[in-house]
């Protein structure tokens, strides 16, 4: 019943914001039309709004889960039209906060102690409020300033209910919408469910921050705040407090004298290093989560501050290698290699013709190379390649989609900081250096040394395993020979059966012909009272039937 009321409310909000037009041609559209008389008249102000703005306002009204839905949609530019994607970006961190007293109760329950014993000071007025959690300022008893991230109350049940409802709606749209194969609603909902599950465990987010901090502890390019583990639990995360400037606040960056050119190049270098050196990248890197250190001493050598570690990405070694090779092939305009890599990586079925895939890659990439270098986007090229490859049954791991949208965000931040940023010039040497180091003899020896204990542990079992494998191969070959003989016998049986069926059909036909000729009394030779041709036909037919019967 609760789900029904929730569905009715969603339908009502959709009608009020005229979002039923997005479902034209579906079964849902007909149901929404029936409900129109029960919804207040649409105001002229709403009617005049763009569809993207109407969708954004509706998602805000429906609550935090639908805000998160919009946030994820805003990053899937391969699925969402540009006008809608641009509007949904504005959903980032614009959610009403919950009561500070409620936050205190959640903290005390999670940490098992009072707020007063955990903190010297705790501000009940939140610094920021997002769709899943909100952040409060606090001070530890040792004087350190921290921020405390607290999950929204009862958010798990609300997410579970809304996800179940979204799955039902997605299934309905997938079966009824004429463009469902392009929209892929079930895929979007599955991604939302995975993303939300990761963001609901703040202890996991703390672990992500801790790993990222370890990788970049000695860097001048990016700073990751320290996790205060003694004040962290599944529903509460306490981090060192940072002061900085949002990376999209260009006016304040200029007023602070920050070298934006140097900063934009650092952002690209950090991203490629995270992906190809560390294989652990920040996958929610929009401007709200990427700040710039406001320390006056860092004007000429600025650094980023990373925030919000709920979504991190990792690639398999195979995907990491093929992605790096793809980038290098794009740099060198080697379309044949791009096509081969898509097949070798298993992203495209092997039966697809390489020449056809090469032509598709050329049609995607060449228009980009006619632009000035400062206007070329690797994220767009990669997105278009993946989009075109869908025609050839492209299969991608979700982490690759995550990387593509993160690259889009990073390039957006970089271009905001420096509109003339040449991403290719910055990214190429970083990628080449990382690949040289990664596939160098020194790195191979390091990996061998790391695996040496494992190799030594399994070494005594190696002769036995080899012997077992050889025995299996011999037995398998014998078994294959038996199967082959059985198949040959079956083939001969089928051939014999086919001949008998043919003989039976021919014999029956000739006997029928003999009977017809006998009844017609044709002119010609007779043997007694029987026409010769009838006699011949009958004899041959009888022989054919006897042959079919005898072989059975």
From Swiss-Prot:
The keyword DNA-binding does not apply. Its EC number is 2.7.-.-. It is an enzyme of class 2 (transferase). It comes from the Bacteria. The chain crosses the membrane at residues 501-521, 526-546. Residues 121-504 form the Protein kinase domain. One of its GO terms (molecular function) is protein kinase activity. The active site is at 284 (proton acceptor). Its main location: membrane. One of its GO terms (cellular component) is plasma membrane. The keyword Transferase applies. Pathway: Cofactor biosynthesis; ubiquinone biosynthesis [regulation]. It is a multi-pass membrane protein. One of its GO terms (biological process) is regulation of ubiquinone biosynthetic process. ATP binds at residues 127-135, 149. It holds the Pfam family ABC1. Keywords: ATP-binding, Cell inner membrane, Cell membrane, Kinase, Membrane, Nucleotide-binding, Transferase, Transmembrane, Transmembrane helix, Ubiquinone biosynthesis. It is found in: Cell inner membrane. Is probably a protein kinase regulator of UbiI activity which is involved in aerobic coenzyme Q (ubiquinone) biosynthesis. Belongs to the ABC1 family. UbiB subfamily. This is Probable protein kinase UbiB.
């Amino acid at each position: 019943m609760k789900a029904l009321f929730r569905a009715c409310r969603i339908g009502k909000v959709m009608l009020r914001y005229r979002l039923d037009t997005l479902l034209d041609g579906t079964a849902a559209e007909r149901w929404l039309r029936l409900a129109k008389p029960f919804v207040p008249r649409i105001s002229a102000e709403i009617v005049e709004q763009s569809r993207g703005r109407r969708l954004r306002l509706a998602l805000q009204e429906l609550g935090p889960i639908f805000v998160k839905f919009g946030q994820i949609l805003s990053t899937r530019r391969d699925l969402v039209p540009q006008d809608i994607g641009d509007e949904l970006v504005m959903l980032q961190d614009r959610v009403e906060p919950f009561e500070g007293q409620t936050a205190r109760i959640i903290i005390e329950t999670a940490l098992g102690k009072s707020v007063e014993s955990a903190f010297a000071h705790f501000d009940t007025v939140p610094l920021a409020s997002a769709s899943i959690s909100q952040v409060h300022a606090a001070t530890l008893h040792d004087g350190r300033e921290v921020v405390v991230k607290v999950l929204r109350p009862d958010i798990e049940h609300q997410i579970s209910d809304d996800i179940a409802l979204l799955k039902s709606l997605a299934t309905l749209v997938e079966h009824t919408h004429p463009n469902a194969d392009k929209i892929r609603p079930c895929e979007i909902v599955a991604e939302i469910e995975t993303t939300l599950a990761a963001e609901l465990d703040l202890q996991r987010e703390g672990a992500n921050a801790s790993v990222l901090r370890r990788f970049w502890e000695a860097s001048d390019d990016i700073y990751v705040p320290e996790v205060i583990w003694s004040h962290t639990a599944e529903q509460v995360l306490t981090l060192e407090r940072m002061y900085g400037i949002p990376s999209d606040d260009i006016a304040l960056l200029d007023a602070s004298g920050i070298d934006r050119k140097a900063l934009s190049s650092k952002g690209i270098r950090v991203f490629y290093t995270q992906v190809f050196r560390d294989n652990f990248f920040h996958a929610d890197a929009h401007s709200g989560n990427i700040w710039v250190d406001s320390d006056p001493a860092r004007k000429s050598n600025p650094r980023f501050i990373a925030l919000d570690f709920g979504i991190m990405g990792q690639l398999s070694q195979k995907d990491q290698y093929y992605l790096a090779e793809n980038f290098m092939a794009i740099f060198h305009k080697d379309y044949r290699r791009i096509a081969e890599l898509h097949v070798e990586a298993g992203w495209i079925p092997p039966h697809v013709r390489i020449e056809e895939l090469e032509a598709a890659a050329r049609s995607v990439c060449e228009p980009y190379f006619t632009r000035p270098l400062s206007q070329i986007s690797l994220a767009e090229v990669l997105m278009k390649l993946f989009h075109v490859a869908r025609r050839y049954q492209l299969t991608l791991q979700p982490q690759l989609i995550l990387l593509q949208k993160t690259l889009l965000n990073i390039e957006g931040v970089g271009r905001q900081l420096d509109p003339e940023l040449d991403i290719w010039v910055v990214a190429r040497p970083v990628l080449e250096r990382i690949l040289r180091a990664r596939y160098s003899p020194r790195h191979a020896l390091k990996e061998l040394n790391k695996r040496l204990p494992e190799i030594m542990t399994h070494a005594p079992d190696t002769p036995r395993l080899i012997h077992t494998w050889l025995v299996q191969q011999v037995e398998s070959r014998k078994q294959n020979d038996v199967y082959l003989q059985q198949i040959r016998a079956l083939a001969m049986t089928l051939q014999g059966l086919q001949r008998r069926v043919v003989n039976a059909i021919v014999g029956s036909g000739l006997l029928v012909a003999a009977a017809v000729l006998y009844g017609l009394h044709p002119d010609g030779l007779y043997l007694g009272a029987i026409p010769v041709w009838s006699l011949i036909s009958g004899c041959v037919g009888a022989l054919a039937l006897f042959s079919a019967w005898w072989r059975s």
